[in-house]
């Protein structure tokens, strides 16, 4: 009995360590999601036609997959089909679509794994627009690259750039946001700036004329945080009030019957907003009490209210007050709570919610921390499903499998075969976390799965 209790305690501790404080930061693109775990490892899932998952394939993933073995990732940003990330040493990396040079590597070639951009090691802040990229270094200088059809690079022309170009000579840039073809930024003095496309008023300067250079929005110097998507922008002031401008049809952001908001317009009267993120047609926000709110289009369940209806004004999601980090994809929502658990809702056509399905969700659904990730060298043709499972795990495209060994978290072998199986019966396994070890060409590949 004592031995069994010790083993049970060890299992509980091991299981807890796999779940505790799992997800640290998240970002979402058009149909994919990227995330950093608390151990500094990089993960991704969802649509992958341009290699935006970063696992050296173009196969969609409906469960989180680890990208490489590095554990020193600290910041990330997802665009429509490309990503940016910063390591703890200040180096900048990118991968995915590169049609417009948005990866910044001097080419227009898609990259299926993260590659380093230049040799600088002083990058501090990044954001990815639909097809362009922005970054601030530790000196407060702003850089831009990628598509520039409307002047969203802010360098005075409309020529695409496939390497980072400095935006002006100022060195007091603090934070940045990027939409389809416009950019916004905050300076350290609290002033707000914008440039690029302006047909819907997304620059917030009172007209619809594009700007090839950064222009100041109003005279206020009390802006605190910003975000942008497609043809609109949102921001929070230092007094906790929430503002929006740009495309507003059909009153997704400000319910005033106006399609285009040419200047920042306040959303409601609340003054306790903490952070804001926006998708294509919806927005989510945190309040100072760590409650989570959403509004706008709910066509795919992205508002997480249990329906597909539109909502205005901002409405609280559940009654919890433990939310910490938020982000939006185009039509889906992600949020991390103070326990480090990740929850998602909305459109799931490419598996971007990370729950192992491609079914839309109208309520928040948890993403397992111990997911179907290859945690050493990745073998891109293998997929394992369902995960979690009650009875069988299926191994698809497992070409030339020489041996299969399944171990529990204590390392004990519970199943072993040299047969080339496409399905393994795990119905008799106790509930818990297991490691599927697949041997191919004298190499071993590990995949975690959960038996419920």
Model-derived regions, located:
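Hydrophobic loop/turn residues within beta-sheet-rich immunoglobulin-like superfamily modules
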Residues: 36, 86, 120, 136, ...
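An edge-strand/N-cap motif at the start of beta-rich repeat modules
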Residues: 19-49, 64-65, 294, 329, ...
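C-terminal outer-membrane/trafficking sorting elements
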Residues: 377-452
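Short glycine/serine- and acidic-residue-enriched loop/turn motifs that recur at repeat junctions
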Residues: 32, 45-63, 96-113, 146-163, ...
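A recurrent domain-boundary module in secreted/ectodomain proteins
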Residues: 360-373
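Bacterial Sec-dependent N-terminal signal peptides
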Residues: 1-22, 374, 387, 435, ...
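Thr-biased low-complexity repeat/linker tracts and other Thr-enriched repetitive architectures
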Residues: 38-42, 49, 63, 87-92, ...
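Conserved core positions of repeat-based scaffolds
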Residues: 32-35, 44, 82-85, 94, ...
């Amino acid at each position: 009995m004592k031995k069994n209790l010790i083993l049970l305690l060890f299992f509980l501790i091991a299981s807890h360590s796999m779940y505790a404080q799992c997800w640290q930061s998240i970002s979402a693109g058009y149909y994919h999601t990227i995330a950093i775990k608390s151990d500094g490892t990089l993960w991704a899932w969802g649509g992958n036609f341009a290699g935006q998952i970063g696992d050296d394939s173009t196969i969609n993933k409906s469960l989180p997959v680890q990208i490489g073995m590095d554990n020193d990732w600290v910041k990330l940003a997802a665009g429509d089909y490309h990503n940016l990330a910063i390591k703890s040493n200040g180096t900048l990396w990118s991968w995915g679509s590169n049609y417009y040079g948005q990866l910044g590597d001097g080419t227009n070639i898609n990259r299926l794994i993260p590659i380093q951009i230049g040799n600088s090691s002083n990058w501090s802040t990044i954001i990815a627009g639909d097809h362009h990229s922005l970054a601030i270094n530790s000196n407060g200088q702003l850089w831009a690259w990628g598509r520039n059809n409307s002047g969203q690079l802010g360098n005075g022309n409309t020529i695409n750039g496939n390497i980072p170009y400095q935006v002006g000579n100022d060195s007091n840039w603090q934070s940045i946001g990027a939409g389809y073809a416009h950019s916004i930024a905050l300076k350290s003095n609290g002033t707000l700036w914008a440039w690029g496309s302006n047909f819907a008023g997304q620059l917030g300067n009172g007209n619809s004329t594009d700007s090839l250079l950064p222009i100041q929005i109003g005279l206020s110097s009390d802006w605190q945080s910003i975000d942008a998507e497609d043809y609109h922008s949102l921001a929070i002031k230092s007094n906790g009030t929430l503002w929006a401008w740009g495309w507003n049809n059909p009153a997704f952001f400000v319910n005033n019957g106006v399609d285009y908001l040419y200047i920042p317009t306040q959303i409601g009267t609340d003054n306790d907003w903490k952070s804001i993120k926006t998708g294509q047609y919806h927005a989510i926000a945190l309040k100072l009490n760590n409650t989570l709110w959403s509004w706008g289009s709910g066509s795919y369940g992205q508002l997480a209210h249990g329906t597909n209806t539109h909502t205005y004004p901002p409405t609280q999601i559940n009654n919890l007050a433990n939310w910490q980090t938020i982000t939006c994809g185009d039509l889906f929502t992600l949020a991390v709570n103070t326990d480090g658990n990740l929850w998602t809702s909305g459109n799931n056509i490419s598996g971007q919610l990370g729950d192992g399905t491609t079914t839309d969700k109208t309520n928040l659904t948890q993403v397992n921390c111990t997911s179907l990730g290859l945690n050493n060298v990745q073998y891109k043709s293998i997929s394992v499903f369902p995960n979690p499972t009650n009875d069988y795990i299926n191994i698809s495209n497992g070409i030339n499998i020489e041996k299969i060994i399944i171990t529990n978290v204590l390392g004990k072998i519970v199943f072993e075969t040299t047969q080339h199986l496409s399905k393994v019966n795990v119905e008799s396994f106790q509930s818990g976390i297991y490691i599927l070890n697949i041997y191919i060409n004298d190499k071993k590949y590990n995949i975690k799965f959960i038996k419920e």
